[in-house]
């Protein structure tokens, strides 16, 4: 993880996203000046263990646990945390109680910023669109048309190659 993190930073990454890494890993990366953004609430990789793709922190006990987890991530050295599908009031309270950046994904406007995937924003998510996603423009048909045109262009190229149509003086020396 350390080697790859430095590689990504060297090629332009601003931060490494560590969804559900251990505090030990986050501390080790912090000690090597690798900025880490972490993830609490609905962490998709943990869906099997948390009851599926459902909101987290809806009871007082679970909300407190998300706050404690966020504070532990802060102590370990994370520079920020994504709060995914957490009740807006819980996300707002957490944002006020931590010193690191908070990003909301389906957790209301009380965080420091918002986080959505480009394919959701642009409307070309395949399958079920998450409830917390917001589509701003529906590019699905345009992307499908563009993909069809790409395929057709390569078919034409293949045909010209098979039929030896590269003797045009405009493209040969």
Question: Which sequence ranges carry the predicted segments?
Answer:
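Alpha/beta enzyme core
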Residues: 1-173
